[in-house]
Structure formats: C-alpha cells, structure tokens
Amino acid sequence: MEYNKLLADMVPGDRVEGFYILKEGAIKTSNSGKPFLSATVTDKSGSLDLKAWDYSGPVGAPTDAGKVVKIRADVTEYRGSIQLTASNVRMATQEDSYDVSALVPVAPIDRDETLEKVRSLIASMEDRDYRVLAETMLERHLETFRSIPAAKSVHHSFLSGLLMHTANMLCLADFLAGQYSQIIDRSLLLTGTLLHDFAKEKEFTFSQLGVVTDYSRKGQLLGHLVMGAQEIAQVAAELGTPEEKSLLLQHMILSHHGEPEFGAAVKPMFAEADLLSQIDMLDSRMEIYAETLPGVPAGTFSSRIFALDKRIYHHE
C-alpha cells in the first residue's frame, strides 16, 4: 500500500491510500441495479476517474465537489485509461492531517513577477482613457485575478491560472500589435486582453481551497462575457471614458469566443476584437497541449481530447 502517491505517478497494479480533492462525483445505478460512485479526483499532478462499486455514500452529494476525500483504491486500467477502483471513500475530517500543497495544482509561474509584467504592459499604453480604465479594474479585481483558475477544466484550471493565461495573452498581444501596427490600436488590444476574463470570478463557485467547483447562478444565466461587458460599461461611465471606447471594449468581451457556437454573443467585428479572439484560442490550445503531452509516451497518440475534438501526437 502506497500513501498519498501523486495521481500522475500511479500505474496499474498499485494499491494506494490517501487524500485527494473530489472534483466531481455522483451516486449512480449499475445495470444490475446496485448503487456505485462515479467520480473524478485530483491533486496537483492531475486527475483520475474513480469508481466505487456497491457504494451509496457518504460521498456523492453535489455539495461535495471541491472537498477533500480520503480513499483506498486499486489502480486499474479501463479502455486504455488509468482509473481508480476504490474500496473505501470518505470525506476528510478536521482530525485528518494532509498537505494541501500536494492537492491543489498551481500555475508554474512566479505570481509576483508575472503580475509585475502585467502592470508594466498596462502602464506602457499610450491612450490615457484605456490605461486608467485598465488600471482601475485591475486594482478592483487584484486578489481574485492573481489567484483563481482560468477555467473549470479545459485549460489553466489551476490556482493562478487566470493570471498566467492573461499574462501570456498580453505578451502575444503586445507583439502582434507591433506586427500589425498599421491596423491595430495597441492600447485597445491590451485593455481588452487584460479584461476579457475578469468576470470569471463571478461565473464560478470556488471551494475553500480555491478550486472551481461549478458555475454560479449568474454564471449559468449570464456568463462571463455578458457580466464582463456590463462591468466595463459601469466602470467606464464612472471614469468618464468616452462612449465609443467603452463600446469597443464591451464588444471585445462579448465576441472574444469568436463564434456563437463557442459562446460568443456576437462575432468579432473589428481587428482588435478578432485578434483578441485568436490570441485567446491560441494560448488556450497550447496550454491543453502542455497539460496533455507529459502523460502521453513519446511516439504515441493521446486519447481523444474533447476541447480539441481530436487526438494529439507526442513526437520524439
């Protein structure tokens, strides 16, 4: 029996016991009519599916997502994927002792240095209206911006993921603004890039460890695009930002998913909005590669990745 082994290090045949985060889980009924737990557990190294047969609780309520559980399980393989077959699953208690830093994945960045890079790029914007709006909203969102994940599961779904994702995008935006300077307003592009996901702090609910557990009521009814555009309109009005500049930024937020089928309220209708959408897609997709490839042996293909709608190849 191995204790608190990282999920990424587990191989079929291992017997493990330890503490992990319940990402999601539900009690279901098998074909034979017996209850079982179907769940996903995570730690800082990744995630694995878990099954506990002939199991009716206590773990499995919707409110359990994001909490720490203790499991005892065999590591097995099913249809080419490693999973856990648990003989015991319970909620962690106050009497239990576990290392939180081993459970929660954190962005591989220096947060202070990355935030300073963001501040420097914003301070370098020539347009005062955009610069003041960007700096004002950054200060209002600072604590959550530097700490929350960028997504629930698809990309940058670790602590400080939003900071990492946004900083990456700002560097790309800065370069591309110079590359296409004849048509790109750099200050507009950088401001839209900074603000594009700020409303995710309202879109998600978070566990006590800071992990995204679900979409909030507002997140489901409105989404971060609409809430983000609404806040920009409000703050711009407070600051006296010209209406045209506020409108351009709102459009960038509402359109940054590119196509309605991907959640955009409208399609991008000017160069900076289109470029923001492309930059967002680029960094998101590259992060999916970065998170997937370490688990794919060189010279082989991954399983199908839903967000990419394909398998990917890990070349030598």
Q: PLM features: what roles do these ranges have?
A:
Residues 20, 66, 169, 253, ...:
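Divalent metal-coordination and catalytic microenvironments
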Residues 277, 294-295, 299-316:
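N-terminal intrinsically disordered, cationic/polar leader segments
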Residues 25-35, 48, 55-101:
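OB-fold single-stranded nucleic acid-binding module
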Residues 1-16:
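OB-fold nucleic-acid-binding modules
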Residues 83-149:
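Extended, charge-rich, solvent-exposed interface segments
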Residues 154-156, 164, 175-296:
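Divalent metal-dependent catalytic cores for phosphoryl transfer on phosphate-bearing substrates
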Residues 38-43, 206:
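Short, acidic/hydrophobic/Gly-rich beta-strand patch recurrent on exposed beta strands
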Residues 130-174, 195-199, 203:
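A short mid-domain helix/strand-loop element embedded in enzyme catalytic domains
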